[in-house]
């Protein structure tokens, strides 16, 4: 992939950009096989990859510069700002949004936050696009509510320029730290969730719910999990760390009992909305801590699907699953190192199947799906 920002030495986020995609996939596969070298893996499935550029559905832009000439991008370690509006990972549909946002910031008087001086209001711009209809969600991350009235007043101009903006919010993040968002979300539009669709499954994206950034590969990941589950004798499953319900909603059948657990209430609201649309009445989604939920249950499903954050599922949940011994575990991981550590803690399971998904091209990161079967 050609990138003027990389060639000019202005951005080094894509550390593997000089390697061809097949070379990147080979290196990632070798890394995964090395991590799982102590285990017997029955089947290595072919790796899945997607487009090498224009694939991201989300932009997280630090706002810097001045109110008259804002920069959208990132800050280098020395505090120097870098405009990333031309990043080739973003789809072409993002360019007109960035182009309209710069004069809008001036119109609304949203002074960019200056980290060194601890002054200013606008910290980040967060943009998400739906692949199904091109609708977008725009979030202004502000230090306080000081400029909220000005933002509301100027908003009709932006909506006229960009009718694709379906959901617009102001997120209040008052802490002087590199934290992307605060707890308070103020909706500036009537619509509060962005409609998405993968493999004919309706999904919803709300401001504070996690959603995969590579929709082409994510939809293949969910479809693969569904295919694996359909091959198993499963009538009851748990979907832990379920997010907006992507895995559970794909895997569920009308006669299957499924419980999805996620700590973020916003994500659970999305999952419930999707389940209602699909008419799946035996699905239950609850906003709870996944480990706490699992370890207080008396009954055990045939299948537990886990999709934890980078830290993995951790020893308490591993110990519980080892004791309760569900027949199958499907582990989806964005960090194969912590997944490997967790699998070591899961006693009495063999690895039936492993598949790598290249969710993050041009970096060392990847997603992996693993099927574990009780011995």
Curated annotation (Swiss-Prot):
Catalyzed reactions per annotation: uridine(747) in 23S rRNA + S-adenosyl-L-methionine = 5-methyluridine(747) in 23S rRNA + S-adenosyl-L-homocysteine + H(+)
The keyword Metal-binding is annotated on this UniProt entry: yes
One BP annotation, GO: rRNA base methylation
Gene source species: Escherichia fergusonii (strain ATCC 35469 / DSM 13698 / CCUG 18766 / IAM 14443 / JCM 21226 / LMG 7866 / NBRC 102419 / NCTC 12128 / CDC 0568-73)
HAMAP family: 23SrRNA_methyltr_RlmC
EC numbers on record: 2.1.1.189
InterPro entries: 23SrRNA_MeTrfase_RlmC, MeTrfase_TrmA_AS, MeTrfase_TrmA_CS, SAM-dependent_MTases_sf, U5_MeTrfase_fam
Entries under Pfam families matching the protein: tRNA_U5-meth_tr (PF05958)
Its biological purpose: Catalyzes the formation of 5-methyl-uridine at position 747 (m5U747) in 23S rRNA.
Coiled-coil ranges from the UniProt annotation: none
Family named by the database record: Belongs to the class I-like SAM-binding methyltransferase superfamily. RNA M5U methyltransferase family. RlmC subfamily.
Gene Ontology molecular-function annotations: 4 iron, 4 sulfur cluster binding; iron ion binding; rRNA (uridine-C5-)-methyltransferase activity
Binding site for S-adenosyl-L-methionine: 212, 241, 262, 307
Keywords: 4Fe-4S, Iron, Iron-sulfur, Metal-binding, Methyltransferase, rRNA processing, S-adenosyl-L-methionine, Transferase
Keyword Lyase: no
Catalytic residues, chain numbering: 334
Protein's UniProt name: 23S rRNA (uracil(747)-C(5))-methyltransferase RlmC
Principal EC category: transferase
Binding annotation for [4Fe-4S] cluster: 3, 11, 14, 87
Database matches in PANTHER family: RNA M5U METHYLTRANSFERASE (PTHR11061), TRNA (URACIL(54)-C(5))-METHYLTRANSFERASE (PTHR11061:SF30)
